[in-house]
Amino acid sequence: MKNVLALSLLLFSLSAAAQCDSVSEINVQIVELAKKKLGKKVDRGECWDLAKYVLDETGANWDGFLKFGMALKKGECVMPGDIIQFDKLKTVMVVNGLKTSESFPQHTAIVYEVKNADELVLIHQNTGYTGKKVGTSTFKFSTITTGKYTIYRPIAH
């Protein structure tokens, strides 16, 4: 039991990110563009399509593939408009006594809101919640059991 608790605390400390004191202009624009698409399908409805749309519309500097800007280091502050790329990530949580799990084999999402160091609200599409349409969902770093993620800070041209 002590080992499980120690591992959980280690995962949380490596995963949690601080909230930034301010939000960059390009990130504000990204959130506003994504918000206007709530309930709508962007392009093919793939998760990546929403990120591509907001980055292209803002004229952001990115590689057109999976490098959505500058990769943040663990522990750096996260702001709305940052883009998170999940890779083979799994989460497990207990809600009202029920154990639920979620898998993100390869998924792209935009940070919509930073609740605290552990909890984000994501805006994304191609999910189990909203299908191919843009919607929001909560993500907690403390629920990660396996896999990895990278958070990118969009860069203005």
Regions found by a protein language model. Name each.
Residues 1-21:
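Bacterial Sec-dependent N-terminal signal peptides
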Residues 19-70, 89, 99-104:
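N-terminal capping segments
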Residues 13-15, 41, 116:
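Hydrophobic alpha-helical elements and their junctions with loops/disorder across both membrane
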Residues 21, 25, 102-157:
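Aromatic- and glycine-rich peptidoglycan recognition patches
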Residues 8, 61, 66, 71, ...:
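Compositionally biased, intrinsically disordered low-complexity regions
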Residues 60-128:
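...with weaker cross-activation on analogous glycine-rich loops/strands in unrelated enzymes
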